Amino acid sequence: ASDVYKRQVQGQPGSEMIAIENPENVAKHWEDLGAENLHIIDLDGTIDGKTSLDVIKKILKEVSVPIQLGGGIRSIDYAKRLLDLDIERLIIGTMGIEHPETITQLSDEYGSERIMISLDSKDNRVVIKGWQEKIDKSPAELSNEFKEHGAGSILFTNVDVEGLLGGFYTEPVIELKNSVDLPIVYSGGITSISDVKQLNESGVEGIVIGSALYKDKIDLKEALKYQNR
């Protein structure tokens, strides 16, 4: 995972920052190590409302593996602009939750398999707007609603543990997996190879590893050995 902010790879809001120049080189590095998908979040768009579209285009030119991209998507026109760049999946958070009809429109035009809804969870309630606002629905409730609107997959982030390198909680993942018939990609608190193995056994489609890779807590090649076991 790479979070792009001010043309650098950075950490999550509120966590310790890891600044690395040239995001496109970082993306290429992970591809060269065997990553089969890349997870890119535009923190410029999320935090400042000013997108890093130029950096995103450079990354797309540099790598050949599929990319799922999110962050700062506040209009359906911008969403279409990103989908037209041939990213594999577009991750939509706040806009989709506040305006679910946009999910239906994008799904109808581009295919549900390219539309991923981002559900960030704190205390089993979904949070939006950069984790600043909590809504009174659980991830399981919203997942089923968005399946009806045409979302093709779920990115589930446990905000309680994201970026803290303290491990993850199994229960929220299992609850969501048992509640909705959609592919789930999990993010948040993945710290060790043991976490990778446990999540793979839970049946999620994929996992997002960020801080643990940059801080050498997890070796990517070792983690990939547990893929689809």
Segments from the language model and where they lie:
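Short, small-residue-biased leader/transition segments that mark boundaries at the very start
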Residues: 1-5
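C-terminal helical cap(s) of enzyme catalytic domains, especially alpha/beta-barrels
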Residues: 103-110, 200-201, 206-209, 213-229
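Catalytic cores of alpha/beta
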Residues: 67-86, 173-206
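Glycine/small-residue-rich loop that forms an oxyanion/phosphate-binding "nest" at active or ligand-binding sites
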Residues: 44, 51-108
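Alpha-helix-loop-beta-strand connector modules within alpha/beta enzyme cores
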Residues: 48-68, 105-119, 165-192
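Structural preference for beta-strand elements that scaffold enzyme active sites
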Residues: 37, 64-68, 88-91, 114-118, ...
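Anionic-ligand binding region
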Residues: 105-106, 113-115, 119-152
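Glycine-rich, proline-tolerant flexible connector loops at the mouths of alpha/beta enzymes
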Residues: 37-54, 156-166
